[in-house]
């Protein structure tokens, strides 16, 4: 286990296959170069957006506005709908990402009718630093070419479309591109500029302040867990817990470390109970700047 709930298998590996390339050119120049038309794959449209860099400024921790708007905008500017896509590659920067994307696109995640990964994502192909999604573009190109060849053999002239979702950070960066075996039927070209704003603009309705390094002040405050993780040691033991939550009295969001062993064990499911939404207590560490959290008042780690 690295950080709960992600074991080593679900974490990114930097040094995997680093080499990939693609050639992007115009129809005129492709003809001038003598590239056979059965090799051509058309980029129809794309979009990209990122969440706020400070994770504690996000609206919630169970969805991604950047992911959803990037997917919707890329499909829209490409003149496509989800049902028009034949192949997906939804990169799993963490396992939650393709689940969230599939949920937003209304694709069954456990038994999808169409492939939602071509290379296997993080588990089978590595992760951060290896430029995964350029590999996805090259693999999508190969598979779309193959589908076109098979269709031509059966006198089927329809277009085949693919969608690639690239992402990185902590659900931070999202980029989507749609590729096709045919140019757009409406004659439109790839759009000028990004249809999305660069950064998510919305903030939580009740988000006015965060309890930061100044701590929660004196006293003990009741708080609700919004999200959490636990960092494990080299000996695979829970080491330090991290909590993001809300103070019940003021609605302020707080960030805290876990203040006692019992709470720490509760976070890693030794009790079998999910703790998101559960109430506990927050206080400022004595002679320190950290907030501490525990299910019992002012417990000690």
Language-model segments: residues:
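OB-fold/S1-family single-stranded nucleic acid-binding modules
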Residues: 285-301
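Condensing-enzyme catalytic core mediating Claisen C-C bond formation in acyl metabolism
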Residues: 2-64, 138-139, 154-158, 164-259
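Extended, hydrophobic alpha-helical segments in both membrane/secreted and soluble proteins
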Residues: 66-75, 84-101, 137
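Phosphate/pyrophosphate-binding loops at sites that engage ATP/ADP/AMP, CoA/4′-phosphopantetheine
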Residues: 71-84, 108, 212-219, 263-264, ...
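Active-site-proximal alpha-helical scaffold in enzymes
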Residues: 22-28, 77-80, 128-151
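Flexible glycine-rich surface loops and low-complexity tracts that mediate binding to linear polymers
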Residues: 270-288
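Conserved catalytic cysteine-centered active-site region
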Residues: 1-3, 9-10, 48-51, 61-66, ...
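Short glycine/threonine-rich loop-to-helix capping motif typified by GTGT followed
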Residues: 58, 92-109, 127-132, 170-182, ...
